[in-house]
Structures are given as C-alpha cells and as structure tokens.
Design a protein with these regions (language model features):
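K/E-rich alpha-helical interaction surfaces of small helical-bundle regulatory domains
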Residues: 1-10, 243-247, 254, 259
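Generic detector of bulky aromatic hydrophobic side chains
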Residues: 23, 41-43, 47, 112, ...
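Beta-rich nucleic-acid/ligand-interaction surfaces
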Residues: 162-168, 258-265
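Extracytoplasmic cell-surface/polysaccharide-interacting catalytic and binding patches
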Residues: 59-156, 171-253, 262-276
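Peripheral terminal and inter-domain segments
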Residues: 1-78
Length: 276
C-alpha cells in the first residue's frame, strides 16, 4: 500500500475490502506536483510501466514539519507589526464561543498551543477552541450525531488570530503554500468560522487513523485522496457527512478543515485568546 509515480503519472496502491487495488489520482490531485526527492527505491510494475514509490509524508503517527523560512522571533515581530486587510461592508457582530462550554464531551488537541505542529513552535498561550456561535452550535450538533455511531469530535483548531496566519504564510516555502491561507485575504479561521478536527473513538478515547496526519502538506491530506485503507476512507467520509449535514464544507486540500456556510458574514479578527 502506498503511492507511486512514473513520468508524472501518479497512482495509489490501496486496500479495498481486503484486496489490493490500483487507482489513479483524480484531476483535483494533479495540482500537487511530485518532488523527485520523494521518490524511494522500491517500485511497482503495472501495465508494463515501472512506478517508483513516493514518500509523500511522514510515517503514521509522526507530525509533518517544515523548515521555516525565518526564525520564529522574526516571524512574530513582523506579524504583530502588520495589520489585517481592511474590509468594507456590513458584518455580523463577533460572538466567539468556547466549544467546551457547550459540550464537555468534545475533546481538544490544540496543536498550536504546543510544539507538536508543522512549525514546531507554540502560538497560543492555552489550549482553547473558539468559533462564532452559529458555527460552534453546528459543530456540537455534528459531534452529538456522531456519538450514536461510536465516535466524537477531536478539535485541533478553531478561531485563529490573523497574526498567526501571517506567521504561517511567511514561514512556509512557496511550493507548500496551497496548504496555508494568504494573509492578504484573511482566512476563514480568522473569522471564527473554520474548524480543524478529526474523530475519536468513544470506546477507547483515542483518535482514529485517517489517510494523513493533521497539517500534513501532501496529497494525502486532500479530501478526495484515493489511497489508504478502506477503514481510513470510511472514517474520513463519516466525518465529512456529519459536518456537511450541519452546514460546513470541507476545504479542498485538507480533509480536517471545515468552513461554516456563513463565514463571509464575519470580520477578520486578530485578537489573542486572552483578549476574547
């Protein structure tokens, strides 16, 4: 099981119903170019073509990390000195709600409150998750619907101050910027209407295994990535169905990122958690 490439043609060897299956990458995955440095030594011969195995991301359970383009302190200084883009028009008043105050059974694993994230740096002073009230209530409804199937929601991030988005953008190498928001436009996280999340098993309390890890900047993160196991794809779909039923849409390059339908109605925010 894995991902392979031959002359720009990429395929996945995946498990389906206990059998191995070869599937080509869909058109929406072709924007993710293959770095020659990811080609491993092993190969797969399919229809007389030799495909070399790709190392698209870290091993399961390992956090994806980048080498930032500048030191953390420089990134922070520049971001705090900058201002969010000016916006015109009428917006709804900000009403950020802390998710755990609505349902204590929702779990948190706020990666940016520690160093277990793609930049290996701490951005939040405490592990908290906020969303605009309608988005927060919709998230709780999705969580409660999932409990009937033996799962709950594990939150990685919600409202994200704009200055943090600016730091992510400035730190990320150009080829990987499809995975981070452009601060000149602001992000849905900045508006309090985007949530990063996964499932956890109610019986064990442990997060489930998805086709990629959180914040992995590779094609495995795409919501329509065809690889992985049947169970991983089924769990990804279970999460997506629950979130879409409550008015969320999955982000095109991240299976864990969901935007609430009314995100355009809220202003970009840059307040720290302590200021909320």
């Amino acid at each position: 099981v894995g991902d392979y490439s031959a002359d720009g043609d990429s395929i996945s060897l995946r498990e389906r119903d206990g059998r191995l299956e070869v599937v080509g990458w869909e058109d929406t995955l072709r924007k993710a170019t293959v770095d020659p440095a990811t080609v491993l030594g092993d190969s797969l011969t399919f229809e007389s073509r030799v495909y070399r195995r790709l190392a698209l991301g870290p091993a399961s359970g390992t956090v994806f990390r980048i080498t930032p383009r500048a030191p953390y302190d420089e990134l922070m200084k520049a971001a705090l000195a900058a201002s969010p883009p000016e916006e015109e028009g009428e917006f709804l008043p900000t009403d950020l709600v802390e998710l755990v105050t609505l349902d204590s059974t929702i779990k948190l694993d706020i990666r940016y409150a520690g160093t277990d994230n793609f930049m290996s740096s701490k951005f939040y002073s405490s592990p908290r998750a906020f969303l605009q009230r309608p988005a927060a209530e919709a998230t709780i409804r999705a969580h409660r619907a999932l409990t009937a199937q033996g799962y709950g929601l594990l939150i990685h991030d919600g409202y994200r101050p704009w200055y943090v988005t600016r730091m992510f953008w400035d730190a990320t190498p150009d080829p990987l910027r499809i995975f981070v928001a452009d601060p000149s436009q602001g992000s849905r996280h900045n508006r309090g209407c985007a949530v990063d999340l996964t499932l956890y098993d109610l019986a064990t309390g442990e997060p489930v295994i998805m086709p990629s890890g959180y914040d992995e900047m590779s094609p495995r993160a795409f919501p329509n990535y065809p690889g992985g196991t049947s169970r991983q794809r089924a769990l990804r779909k279970l999460l997506r169905d629950a979130m879409e039923a409550e008015g969320f849409a999955v982000y095109e390059t991240e299976w864990w990122h969901y935007d609430y339908k009314d995100w355009r109605k809220y202003r970009i925010g840059t307040a720290r958690f302590e200021e909320l």
